[in-house]
Amino acid sequence: MAESIIIRVQSPDGVKRITATKRETAATFLKKVAKEFGFQNNGFSVYINRNKTGEITASSNKSLNLLKIKHGDLLFLFPSSLAGPSSEMETSVPPGFKVFGAPNVVEDEIDQYLSKQDGKIYRSRDPQLCRHGPLGKCVHCVPLEPFDEDYLNHLEPPVKHMSFHAYIRKLTGGADKGKFVALENISCKIKSGCEGHLPWPNGICTKCQPSAITLNRQKYRHVDNIMFENHTVADRFLDFWRKTGNQHFGYLYGRYTEHKDIPLGIRAEVAAIYEPPQIGTQNSLELLEDPKAEVVDEIAAKLGLRKVGWIFTDLVSEDTRKGTVRYSRNKDTYFLSSEECITAGDFQNKHPNMCRLSPDGHFGSKFVTAVATGGPDNQVHFEGYQVSNQCMALVRDECLLPCKDAPELGYAKESSSEQYVPDVFYKDVDKFGNEITQLARPLPVEYLIIDITTTFPKDPVYTFSISQNPFPIENRDVLGETQDFHSLATYLSQNTSSVFLDTISDFHLLLFLVTNEVMPLQDSISLLLEAVRTRNEELAQTWKRSEQWATIEQLCSTVGGQLPGLHEYGAVGGSTHTATAAMWACQHCTFMNQPGTGHCEMCSLPRT
């Protein structure tokens, strides 16, 4: 039997060992490599040198001995799609940077924009330390890299987490320019397809067993700032708690933009808050199934918006006369409870961040968490968070549980016959000041949290118009605030704007026009949404002259009576209850019938 040798093959996914013989041909060896890495026979290239010289081809009949490949040698594997330079990839990554991931993934616009930016921190000449002319540079004024920790720590306030794109620049820096950079998602599951043993719980091996996880503070964050466009967006959301005392939940709709206060930073700008069906009490929230969720996302997309996060209240009134609230979330209690961390992780897994540097095509998430809670001054504050990628993996693979009696603690599940769970550790300091490693049973959730600054602009921004008598928000029937044509008629009659675009530019009104059961406009509202998105009054006037809006005006007049100035959207007055009690709506076809009739004039069905 020929003497066996072991050849190491390095790929973007790591190094694997291939057992071969000295007399084995190159073609036979490449078949083993293809099987080990899961490639097609022509889906990769293997080179003797890292600089892609000395390619081993399948057409060669030479043995490994003749190719001077010895026991323990390291060969280099490159997938075919990455074997040569790609102009498409080079347009979206820093110069000289070759990646091993999913080059066909379409990243978000903000990611494409930031990947083309220089990102360096330029400094002016220091009059005291610089000893050179105005055109020279020295260590005191040379531009800094966006990931410079000393610079970030000396900002006011200090930045604990560099931006995600600064982190990418750090990985792609150095002599090798990040030649083998690949952002791999953590997996807590047993790898499938291992044929060397029985499936779990009857067998496991080092090939399919997931690695143990040691929780570390994540050095970067995918979003660096949350900004509400104006105070009205947040105040209308808080009105529910002010009127009921119950906690409330909402989805943040907005867009991702550049955050210029941090090198290569990303900001989540919130333009509107959608409130799904829910049951809230003073200390709990229960989300109900939302049949309109997909429609809301579609309408938001046509308005140039997307779901960027979620928000909930945790408010307890302390002194109703002073209007103060209890300061309950701090370093002595918790910032996010374990249940909230798990919920945030689930949301982030449902909204992954598209990334070309990851073999999976996604890495982390830009989905943010906002909490309306009491601050140190006993006033309402908005706090922003995300959970780490490690937390996302633990939640995705169902390895993390909340603790019932301690909201600040989570619990890593133990392995069972149904599920293998890798060991999860975290580092702590004992009473002697020594660093120790603890098993995450239980686990302080502060190891999973990334804080994000939450702000309001000095100069408010208004994607949607602000009215003194706004259209009711959806799913607030418990307050007596319903979305129907009576409330629409009232809104139109009380609106003081003479510009139709300003009147119709209300996120909740647009959702009602699309989702109402009497006359949904999902197929005919695209022109109006485009007018709102581009702030084009001419397009809005064109849509106003359509049959659909004429029908809506007729319904409003019928339901709310003859409202003076309905078509001008500027007059106030008229009784809105004149005809409501007299006319009746058919339960079968919703046609408004005249009083005194027992059958519907449209469908001829009985009234009851």
UniProtKB/Swiss-Prot annotation:
An example Gene Ontology CC term for this record: UFD1-NPL4 complex
Q: Which Gene3D superfamilies match?
A: Cytidine Deaminase, domain 2, Phosphatidylinositol 3-kinase Catalytic Subunit, Chain A, domain 1, Zn-finger domain of Sec23/24
Outcome reported for the amino acid change (mutating R17A)? Abolished interaction with VCP
Q: Which residues carry this modification: N6-acetyllysine?
A: K179
* Keyword Transmembrane helix found: no
Instruction: Please name the GO terms that the record assigns under molecular function.
Output: ATPase binding; K48-linked polyubiquitin modification-dependent protein binding; K63-linked polyubiquitin modification-dependent protein binding; protein-containing complex binding; ubiquitin binding; ubiquitin protein ligase binding; zinc ion binding
Residue positions where N-acetylalanine is found in the record: A2
What is the top-level taxon of the source organism?
Eukaryota
| Involved pathway(s) | Protein degradation; proteasomal ubiquitin-dependent pathway
Query: Could you say which tissues express the protein in this record?
Result: Expressed at highest levels in brain, heart, skeletal muscle, kidney and fetal liver.
Q: What are its GO biological-process terms?
A: ERAD pathway; Golgi organization; negative regulation of RIG-I signaling pathway; negative regulation of type I interferon production; proteasome-mediated ubiquitin-dependent protein catabolic process; retrograde protein transport, ER to cytosol; ubiquitin-dependent protein catabolic process
* UniProt-annotated location(s): Cytoplasm, Cytosol; Endoplasmic reticulum; Nucleus
Which intervals hold the zinc fingers (RanBP2-type)?
580-608
Q: Which UniProt keywords apply?
A: Acetylation, Chaperone, Cytoplasm, Endoplasmic reticulum, Metal-binding, Nucleus, Ubl conjugation pathway, Zinc, Zinc-finger
Q: What is the effect of changing R50A?
A: Abolished interaction with VCP
Which sequence ranges are marked TM in the entry?
none
Q: Where is the MPN domain?
A: 226-363
Protein family: Belongs to the NPL4 family.
**What is this protein's function?**
The ternary complex containing UFD1, VCP and NPLOC4 binds ubiquitinated proteins and is necessary for the export of misfolded proteins from the ER to the cytoplasm, where they are degraded by the proteasome. The NPLOC4-UFD1-VCP complex regulates spindle disassembly at the end of mitosis and is necessary for the formation of a closed nuclear envelope. Acts as a negative regulator of type I interferon production via the complex formed with VCP and UFD1, which binds to RIGI and recruits RNF125 to promote ubiquitination and degradation of RIGI.
Q: How does it assemble?
A: Heterodimer with UFD1. The heterodimer binds ubiquitinated proteins. The heterodimer binds to VCP and inhibits Golgi membrane fusion. Interacts with ZFAND2B; probably through VCP.
Q: Any notes on this protein's domains?
A: Binds ubiquitinated proteins via its RanBP2-type zinc finger.
Q: Can you name this protein?
A: Nuclear protein localization protein 4 homolog
Originating species: Homo sapiens (Human)
